[in-house]
Design a protein with these regions (language model features):
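Start-transfer (signal-anchor) and selected internal transmembrane alpha helices
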Residues: 1-51, 215-222, 340-341
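Short hydrophobic/aromatic helix or loop-helix immediately within or flanking a transmembrane segment
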Residues: 62-103
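Transmembrane-helix signature of polytopic, membrane-embedded enzymes
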Residues: 107-108, 124-149, 183, 291-295
Length: 364
């Protein structure tokens, strides 16, 4: 048994994929465990619309709340009406494919999310090692902890598009950092078919290429490849709804793009407003260090202009704003007394948001 543990520890220290699997499995077990017992801590939201109700006997149904059931509905029935046109297609398409082999639609959605989480953690490890020239996986893991224990990281393992988007976006960013621009463009292309924020990733790839003084034509080619996912979705929406921008129109029905006079005040007093503040701090932090990371943070901070009255989604979207998490690692990694305290605080906030989500609330 001791030798087996030593072999596993050595394997994780030398193999990024094995470490990614171990970290993902750990966070999934913790998240599901919290949700399983969450009803004893967080009162369940009585609104039936907040929950996935098609598999009442599935004990994991608490992992599919709010937008989660919409993605599963699209996976099963397609885009039956315009109300769901704002949900990007690649995640439900992937769930639909898995559902041909797995009986439960909910389980299919979770399988896609959990496998995507492994991929996202894998690429995050690679990004940390690439940026900081680290060879030790266990040191890189100290940076990844800020990602998997980010307060709203519950969405990486729920039936949301976030897990798949994080995998594809971080893959695109990693390959751009490695100057493998065709691979970066292909990953970015899939990311723009997965999430509305995919274009942020495309723009970041362009900025990283500019920083590396890549020829303009090569930059244009990579950016063009990256936009193909969104272009395909817009083309399909033109055919289906006679409006290539139906995904924007549909957002208004979900309280997006409806700004009111009290919007800024709500931002200040909202928990989600904290994420905007952190993104602005990240932009300031990275400006003298790496301007592309600073601008990427500002892109995500700008989303508060478009979110709805409850400011929902800001924390969730911040998941892929990786310079924000890297800022914490960059600043605290050599502060041995403070680093574990920051990780502990992040874990407490992660627990709060996870219980909140499992109870049928937005959770960020």
């Amino acid at each position: 048994m001791i030798k087996a543990r030593q072999a596993l520890s050595k394997g994780m220290a030398t193999n990024e994929l094995l470490l990614a699997v171990a970290l993902s499995l750990m966070i999934i077990i913790l998240g599901v465990g919290l949700g399983w017992e969450g009803n004893k801590v967080t009162p369940v939201n009585p609104a039936t619309s907040a929950h996935y109700n098609l598999e009442p006997n599935n004990r994991l149904s608490f992992m599919s709340n709010w937008d989660g059931p919409n993605y599963l509905d699209i996976a099963q029935n397609g885009y039956a009406n315009k109300d769901e046109a704002n949900f990007f297609p690649l995640y439900p398409l992937t769930v639909r494919f898995v559902h041909t082999f797995v009986k439960s639609l909910l389980d299919s959605g979770l399988i896609v999310a959990w496998l995507s989480l492994v991929g996202a953690v894998y690429f995050y490890l690679k990004i940390v090692k690439q940026i900081y020239h680290i060879k030790d996986n266990l040191e890189a893991m100290r940076g990844v902890l800020f990602f998997i224990l980010f307060p709203t990281a519950v969405f990486l393992m729920a039936t949301y598009t976030e897990g798949l988007f994080a995998f594809l976006a971080l893959g695109a960013i990693y390959y751009a950092l490695r100057k493998k621009y065709i691979a970066a463009g292909l990953f970015a292309m899939l990311s723009t078919a997965t999430h509305v924020d995919g274009m942020f990733v495309v723009l970041l790839i362009g900025m990283l290429m500019l920083e590396n003084r890549v020829r303009p034509l090569k930059i244009a080619a990579s950016v063009a490849i990256g936009t193909l996912g969104l272009a395909a979705f817009m083309t399909w929406q033109k055919i289906k709804f006679n409006n290539p921008l139906e995904f924007i129109t549909a957002q208004k029905g979900h309280s997006w793009l409806n700004l009111s006079d009290a919007h800024f005040l709500r931002l200040i007093v909202s928990l989600n407003g904290i994420f905007v503040l952190l993104l602005l701090v990240s932009a300031l932090y990275w400006w003298p260090r790496r301007k592309s990371f600073s601008i990427f943070s500002l892109m995500y901070a700008s989303t508060f202009f478009f979110v709805g009255k409850d400011l929902g989604g800001l924390g969730r979207y911040s998941l892929v704003a990786f310079p924000l998490q890297l800022m914490f690692y960059d600043y605290f990694r050599n502060k041995k007394a403070i680093y574990p305290l920051i990780i502990a605080l992040s874990a407490i906030l992660w627990t709060f948001f996870t219980l909140h989500y499992a109870g049928g609330y937005t959770g960020g």
